[in-house]
Amino acid sequence: MSRYRGPRVRIIRRLGTLPGLTNKIPQLKSSSINQSTSNKKISQYRIRLEEKQKLRFHYGITERQLLNYVRIARKAKGSTGEVLLQLLEMRLDNIIFRLGMAPTIPGARQLVNHRHILVNDCIVNIPSYRCKPQDFITIKNQRKSEAIISKNIEFYQNSKIPNHLTYSSLEKKGLVNQILDRESIGLKINELLVVEYYSRQA
């Protein structure tokens, strides 16, 4: 399944707020619709499916990519769900988003694809690149690159940067301090339901 490129508002109306996908807030449905929905029995499969879709759309990845991350998480030590979130959060496109260098993850992915971003002084144009502790992220020393990211930083630095990251506005440099903990996830998600969804596939 390819990456979603359709209307983002339609997705957040169905799944709720997904800050990685869009900074728009979904409008509440009418009470009559809510009432009819609440009267229906929602299957466990649908609940797991929706949690899985939240991860897919928030991080902007394909079905195959998410399944591969689940398989990697299963082989790692620790809680599969927590390791899965760590793998997704340490993607370069997500790190750029969480640092406030881009308004959304698709926006961050575009910066990476267009070679605006350096990791440890080397250009990286792979959005799925897995960052690690002590990696530092900087902007390519070109006027266009700096103008794009400075505008984003000025607008989005009001939002709190998670504890596992640091951004220096003076040096225009982001630092990955450590692997993040569960409390630093910027998404309301039950990752165990996602693991259960893939239990027969991974």
Swiss-Prot record:
<dbReference type="GO" id="GO:0042274">
    <property type="term" value="P:ribosomal small subunit biogenesis"/>
</dbReference>
<feature type="domain" description="S4 RNA-binding">
    <location>
        <begin position="90"/>
        <end position="153"/>
    </location>
</feature>
<dbReference type="InterPro" id="IPR018079">
    <property type="entry name" value="Ribosomal_uS4_CS"/>
</dbReference>
<keyword id="KW-0689">Ribosomal protein</keyword>
<dbReference type="InterPro" id="IPR036986">
    <property type="entry name" value="S4_RNA-bd_sf"/>
</dbReference>
<dbReference type="InterPro" id="IPR022801">
    <property type="entry name" value="Ribosomal_uS4"/>
</dbReference>
<dbReference type="Pfam" id="PF00163">
    <property type="entry name" value="Ribosomal_S4"/>
</dbReference>
<dbReference type="InterPro" id="IPR001912">
    <property type="entry name" value="Ribosomal_uS4_N"/>
</dbReference>
<comment type="function">
    <text>With S5 and S12 plays an important role in translational accuracy.</text>
</comment>
<keyword id="KW-0694">RNA-binding</keyword>
<keyword id="KW-0150">Chloroplast</keyword>
<keyword id="KW-0934">Plastid</keyword>
<comment type="subunit">
    <text>Part of the 30S ribosomal subunit. Contacts protein S5. The interaction surface between S4 and S5 is involved in control of translational fidelity.</text>
</comment>
<dbReference type="GO" id="GO:0006412">
    <property type="term" value="P:translation"/>
</dbReference>
<protein>
    <recommendedName>
        <fullName>Small ribosomal subunit protein uS4c</fullName>
    </recommendedName>
</protein>
<comment type="similarity">
    <text>Belongs to the universal ribosomal protein uS4 family.</text>
</comment>
<dbReference type="InterPro" id="IPR005709">
    <property type="entry name" value="Ribosomal_uS4_bac-type"/>
</dbReference>
<dbReference type="GO" id="GO:0015935">
    <property type="term" value="C:small ribosomal subunit"/>
</dbReference>
<dbReference type="GO" id="GO:0019843">
    <property type="term" value="F:rRNA binding"/>
</dbReference>
<dbReference type="GO" id="GO:0009507">
    <property type="term" value="C:chloroplast"/>
</dbReference>
<comment type="function">
    <text>One of the primary rRNA binding proteins, it binds directly to 16S rRNA where it nucleates assembly of the body of the 30S subunit.</text>
</comment>
<dbReference type="Pfam" id="PF01479">
    <property type="entry name" value="S4"/>
</dbReference>
<keyword id="KW-0699">rRNA-binding</keyword>
<keyword id="KW-0687">Ribonucleoprotein</keyword>
<dbReference type="GO" id="GO:0003735">
    <property type="term" value="F:structural constituent of ribosome"/>
</dbReference>
<dbReference type="InterPro" id="IPR002942">
    <property type="entry name" value="S4_RNA-bd"/>
</dbReference>
